[in-house]
């Protein structure tokens, strides 16, 4: 085993995809600077229940397949929420980098109830009250192992309040 081999799971945000600018920039950066790191970019459903299930399955599979290699998680927006959920419920072994993570998406989703089409994949889905309740059940009020998280926050995000993330991850390495 080459100890430098590693894997990063990238979890995109709501109504996004592995084809988003952030995901593509990360893929290009790793290919150029860290070719020994394999980036895993699953396409997550817009439906929260399916996205959570997909993220859990991919994460668990990577943990099993690459037990002796580095595994990290990067999550952007809703993907940041999912990354925190994975580390808090399945395994806190990996480290995570969160980019403007959604902290309480169940508080934002009421504004998104209804029909949606993912602009990258053309997936059509409906966000319903049951989806919001499911996400609320996975709300994380405190971080068990804050040293596992590095958080990058942008103050000018139109949707996400960076101060919520700054407060939740106050004991983690945060960059505003």
Regions found by a protein language model. Give the residues of each.
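Residue-level signal for short, function-critical loop segments
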Residues: 14, 77, 155
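The alpha/beta-hydrolase serine catalytic core
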Residues: 94-176
